[in-house]
Each structure stands twice: as structure tokens, then as C-alpha cells.
Amino acid sequence: MFDETMRQPPDGEGSVQVEMDPALHIETAKVFAIYGKGGIGKSTTSSNLSAAFSKLGKRVVQIGCDPKHDSTFTLTKRLVPTVIDVLQAVHFHTEELRVEDFVYEGYNGVMCVEAGGPPAGTGCGGYVVGQTVKLLKEHHILEDADVVVFDVLGDVVCGGFATPLQHAERALVVAANDFDSIFAANRIAAAIQAKAKNYDVRLGGIIANRSVATDQIERFNARSGMRTLAHFPDLDVIRRSRLCKSTLFEMEPSPELAAVQQEYLRLAEALWEGVEPLTATPLIDREIFDLLGFD
């Protein structure tokens, strides 16, 4: 017979995710988890946000949670080895690892870590994220951090890739001003609300990205109770920064770039000061279609 703990999922309705080890709690830093539709620019957003925090004098750790391991590419100027790579190299004997084996200093002192992931179709990405946090704790990297940014794979919100939500105090959703990314943002918001029943994480809001206007996002916000925290337009300099292996703070100065840099600094300041948690009500799929899908 199942006991009571088996009958009552600890992590939201129907969840099978295990409860986080209390020893892995990130005590002192402000922790943010960045989600959004695949290809929407989460890594670019995360890296420039980390750079902005560092510009404010904060000690920042960015953790990439995607098997592509390109989250910190513009910060480090290269694809760094992943935690899963270095663990495999030492046959998972963590005592053989040094900090420099999996933590790399990037632009303006941002400490960069790529969790990586298991081979396609095998294992659980959440396990890899958990092992990454465990290693960082063992080597006291997180104790010295002011800010931790989790850059999370696509719009996957299964128990595994929702693992960063166990550590975060605010979850942010990157979305463009179009139906597909808003649809994904709504699903992500629903998953975050489910996690909020048992964890400290709360919705922070939407970061509008690659968008000239935000009218569709604002329509969604008005209906769901979400809000827009920042707006980054669809500029060629942002695309080129990725090709140049650079953050936006390293690109050739221009008036339009200066405006984007200031928006990142404003967002970092707002997040550091603390944004009020949202009590949004995600829409059902039909409501999204009715709201945005048929004009």
C-alpha cells in the first residue's frame, strides 16, 4: 500500500519530482530563473542581465541549464566544458574536481557554469542541474555570490527542467510580441504557479525581447495579471553581438545600443531592489487562441 507521501505529490498536482535536499538551498544570493520559448533569446538576455548586475558591482554566477551549453558563450567567448563532461572525465568522483575544472570567469568577473545535459533520450536534465548546484556548494562558489542566474532550456517545464525553480526566488519569462512565444509564456507561468505552492519561487514578470511593439504582450498581461519588466527591441546590434562573442556592453557604441544597455541596467537595478511577486492567473489554451489567435 502507498503511504501518504506517495499519494500526495510534494511538488504540484501530478508531479513526480523529488523534494530538494535542504543542504542545496542557496542562502545568501538573489536567485533568478529565466524561462521562455526555445530560440527567443534567453541566453542573450541572461548573459546581458548578468553583465548588467556585474556593472552594478554585484558578484554574479550564471548557470546554463541547456545541453547546447551556449548560455555563457558571449561572457566567456567560447563554449566551455560542461559539468556533466567533467564529471564523466573523473568517473563521477567529485572529490577529484577543482573549481577551475567547471567554473570559468567571464566578462567583468561573471562566474560562468554550464550544467550540460545527458545524451539525447536518456537521463534527466534536472539531475544534472542538481549536481551542478551541489558542486558549487561544495566549493563555496555560491556563498560568495550576490546574484545567481539560471538560464533554462527552452519552454520545457517537466519536473527535471523545473529544478531551478526550487532555488529561485523570482522566475522571469522571455517572450516576443507574437502568439507562439506568448502561448509558451502562459504555459510556463502555469508551471511556475504550480511550483509556488511548495517552493519560495514566485513569478516576476515578462521580459519582452526581439519586439518592436508590445501590444500583444500587454493584451495578455491585462487578461492574466502578468506584467512587462523590460523591453528589448529587435535590433541588428543585438544579433551581431552573438556573432561577435560579446555582451552588449562590449559592442561599438551607438545611441540605440546605449538605450538597450540602460534598459538592462534598469532591469538589473529593479530586480536587485526586489520586484513584487505576481499572483497571475494563466489562461487556458482556448482563451489564448481567442485573445490573440483570431483577429
UniProtKB/Swiss-Prot annotation:
Q: Which cofactor does it need?
A: [4Fe-4S] cluster
This protein's name: Light-independent protochlorophyllide reductase iron-sulfur ATP-binding protein
Record Gene3D superfamilies: P-loop containing nucleotide triphosphate hydrolases
What is the gene called? bchL
Enzyme Commission code: 1.3.7.7
- What are this entry's molecular-function GO terms? 4 iron, 4 sulfur cluster binding; ATP binding; metal ion binding; oxidoreductase activity, acting on iron-sulfur proteins as donors; oxidoreductase activity, acting on the CH-CH group of donors, iron-sulfur protein as acceptor
Q: Where does ATP bind?
A: 39-44, 68, 209-210, 233-235
Question: Which superkingdom?
Answer: Bacteria
Q: Which reaction does it catalyse?
A: chlorophyllide a + oxidized 2[4Fe-4S]-[ferredoxin] + 2 ADP + 2 phosphate = protochlorophyllide a + reduced 2[4Fe-4S]-[ferredoxin] + 2 ATP + 2 H2O
